[in-house]
């Protein structure tokens, strides 16, 4: 029953001590595949639970008090909140012990392990994957093959799920819901959450005003829709065309440079030229804008309820567009108004959003040089 609950709330990212989702297969970049990877640590890194230097110990103690303070805000007594804290810390520390370090997670080969659903269910019988996925609207045919990032973590999690009490798992799920909902609830709840995450963890002095937080949330949930408005004002189609021409010229120049290199062998040159020719270039804004007509914001509902609606929309959209389907190379991983750029090695694409293509970085009237 608890895993049914994990699956239901997993749509919102609640209560599931592992990550799941669809993404490009790193060894077959044209297709999406189901991925499972370690997760479940509120503090993110295993060292916060296991290291004993003074700084880490102080953060861990502050985290324990944070848990108690939050549960009390939700109507639990001091004693009940402390009991919840102890159960949560026991479970998360057990997760930390089986988690890989950040350094280990950077090993691409070690974190790419292809499994069949049959193999997964045989190796991890206490992780009811089909049940978890069904609760999120993921059909079995889309998880017949998957990439398991950290098999040893899942083996440890499988044992934990077999030995942990219902009270421990329930407390962990309750905490995950409370913790992740905190920013969308009352000012009192938000203040306690800010005190730990922003002040204790990051050294911030004061919280942003509510209007800035709200603006940021609109950006996070409907960023591409805002980007469309931004581009209409600050990045016309003529600028997009100009930048695409400039990039094309750079590709031609780089092609000639590669051909002229005396230190490169002919097979190496061919591989370099093939990769350059295969670059997928994204400039300014998407050629096709996302359809957000099914995303409903209801002014009669609370901020939190509307946030859940947004998260559900994007979860369903990801499943619909990616489950069992080829990678959409036209999908953008940054909003047009973002002042940044990226290269995605899996899909061999470069992206320059309109936000970075402003003066002094880019001037459509300037000379190429």
Q: Which residues does each predicted region cover?
A:
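Noncatalytic, helix-rich "gating/capping" subdomain that lines the substrate-entry/channel surface
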Residues: 1-245, 249
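Intrinsically disordered, low-complexity linker/terminal regions across diverse proteins
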Residues: 94, 118, 122-126, 135, ...
